[in-house]
């Protein structure tokens, strides 16, 4: 795998909603597709596989739920080629009533940061009729410093998230951040019934 795929200062995650399953594309700042996944339906444990493209031949990394039937659990992000965990993501169940928040963990399970939705927007999105039309604005902190911002843009048959990660430190593998964004999109889909 070309490790330079995961050093771009800009990414875009595109989500298209289809009848049976959502599809997600990861693109760099120039619009080149770097990854693709399709959400599986009726699963006991999340096992999200990110491929190089829609042919789903070359697997790049996996987002693997560590506990069965645990929607609030910890997810390992595994580099498929090396079979190595590059980091983990854990949902903060206590904040999920106000706004989405995930903790970013190193491969050993130590918290190094968080991805969180602005609480005012989160409240609007979750509890106000038609609140889902309020675009998400998500912030990323690593080691106590804000290092990235993610902005949602609505499209006719899906959404897009622009990820500005030029200031991400080397302690955080960008695949972990991108995996967190895909998880947030999938969890939101289940919550909203989309």
What are these regions (language model features)?
Residues 1-194:
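Intrinsically disordered, low-complexity proline/glycine-rich segments
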